[in-house]
Design a protein with these regions (language model features):
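Anion-binding (especially nucleotide phosphate/pyrophosphate-binding) glycine-rich loop
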Residues: 1-88
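Phosphate/pyrophosphate- and phosphate-bearing ligand-binding catalytic cores of soluble enzymes
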Residues: 91-197
């Protein structure tokens, strides 16, 4: 049980900030479902977040955890984060360079935790194809679908994720959230010998 106030962002718009012919900047309200944003981008031929398909949660949560999957992280696309400062009642914008992004880390999990409410995220996507297929089974799954199109990459990622986790609509689960462990080389080698698959 949680003894406190829980705020859920209600704003769910995706707005064009700029398009220079290659880079497309979008302002995404915090309440947009992350996977809906990925599908929206794929439908419009915009590259950059397709490997983050099927990650549950809202766009406003993406910078907090610096969500990532299959060789891509939210920080790769995020340019700015808009937030409401609880202490001052003002709206602030933080450039990505000041978000303290690291492996599943950000300033929002530490210095700004409990002090701000993320209201929107500005991301940069591209019209230029930039497939990232070098992680695990992604390349094989994409090739089986006919090659590296945005749609094929999204479908491959979704297929891989569905094979690993039950559908939360059928069997409630917390999804996949973890940090890869950092161990000594000898420990990793022993694990690979014991579990080659």
């Amino acid at each position: 049980d949680y003894d406190g106030v829980l705020l859920t962002p209600a704003a769910r718009q995706i707005a064009l900030v700029s398009d220079d012919g290659d880079e497309v900047r979008l302002r995404v309200d915090a309440g947009v479902e992350w996977d809906d944003l990925v599908e929206w981008a794929v439908q419009r031929g915009l590259w950059g977040i397709e490997n983050l398909s099927l990650i549950p949660g809202k766009a406003g949560a993406a910078p907090v955890q610096n969500i990532g999957a299959y060789g891509c992280e939210a920080k790769d696309a995020i340019r700015r984060v808009e937030m409401y400062c609880v202490e001052t009642g003002t709206v602030l914008t933080l450039d990505a360079a000041h978000c303290g992004f690291g492996y599943r880390e950000s300033v929002f999990k530490h210095d700004l935790k409990g002090r701000v409410i993320i209201t929107a995220v500005e991301i940069a996507l591209s019209h230029t194809p930039r497939p990232r297929l070098g992680y695990g089974d992604v390349e094989r799954e994409v090739e089986a679908r006919g090659g590296a199109t945005l749609r094929n990459i999204r479908e491959a990622i979704c297929s891989i994720r569905r094979a690993k986790l039950p559908d939360p609509a059928v069997l409630g689960n917390a999804g996949s959230f973890f940090k890869n462990p950092v161990v000594e080389a000898s420990v990793a080698e022993n694990l690979l010998k014991a579990y080659p698959d």
